[in-house]
């Protein structure tokens, strides 16, 4: 990510998103487990959350879980009776996501 893009993303995250212990812990765990830092940003995660929520989704299928960061954002948008299914080909990634 370019410096300007990162600065804008950091600003949006600081002003609009606030702190979230579960998401922060997920990112730390992903790094500690050696996963590539290719998660969506917090702002992108919030956008996924809003899009899923606005669509009224009751079921979400995510292909490619990595460490589960975006999975958490998407799952939070579901109603109580919603269903989140995520698929991950790499065993290590799936184990880390399950921990998160």
Task: State what each model feature region is.
Residues 13-14, 34-36:
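Short, contiguous strand/loop micro-motifs
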Residues 1-23:
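N-terminal auxiliary segments of SAM/dcSAM-dependent transferases
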Residues 30-31:
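N-terminal beta-alpha supersecondary unit
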Residues 3, 38-100:
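S-adenosylmethionine/decaboxylated-SAM
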